[in-house]
Structure formats: C-alpha cells, structure tokens
C-alpha cells in the first residue's frame, strides 16, 4: 500500500513535468504549400502559452513638412503600413515581446483614390515585407487583409491589429 506522502510526491513530480513540457512546447507555423507568400497558412499555439491582443493601430504623421491634415502628411499605403508596424513593434517591445512573436494579424485597408478606390495591396506588402519574412525576422503570422469603406480619419489607409504569444 502506498503512503500518502509517496502519492503526493509522485503527483507533484508528474505535475511539474507536465508544466515544463507545456512551457517547452513551441509555436508551430505551417507554411502555405508550394508558395513563398509571406504569411503562415496556420499557426498552432501550445497550451499554457499567454496570448497578447494588441488593439488596432493607425498611421502617425510621416511627413511633418506636409500641410497639416493633408494626405501627404500621412503618406501612401506603404508609408502608412510602415508607420503602423513600427508602432506595433514598439508596443510589443514595451511588453517584452517582438514582431517574431506575432501569430495572427488582421489588416484593414481603405481604397486609395489614386487607384480608383481599390486598396493598394502591393504598397501594403512592400511595408509588411520589411517586418515579416526577413532574414532577421523570418516568423510569419496567419493573416487576413480586408478592404473596408473607411477608417476614423478619412486620410488613414491602414489599420492593423495583432495577436502575439509570449515565448
């Protein structure tokens, strides 16, 4: 017959082992088959990992020499994407995280009047590729991108929100 102390000790060892295994488990990023497009087809987050939900970020003024409240002050879709991702990077770093910890991204793009009201997806991708799928930061998030009618400021073309996982 087992003594209560032996049972308790065995349970504690098993519990500690399962916690260590959960903490050691890594985020798994599934690539899109036969594609070099820089997003993940899916991302698996193991049990026990904390997720961080970052509210949508919109562009800051990128050209302080442009007239206040002008489209030039906020830049094109590429410039706005870079501005937004820089803010997200800063927010994540303030939380002890980085862009490589992002597992999910939702992108809201407003149509560009210079493109007959269509979203500038190529401009977005030029900015996005500076932060994701690079040699320095190869981790890719699962991502959705939508064209929407408008954002809070009529000069905004980009809003991005992300979910990150603590390593």
Model features per residue range: what roles?
Residues 4-9, 14-86, 90-106, 112-167:
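N-terminal presequence-like segments and the immediate start of the first folded domain
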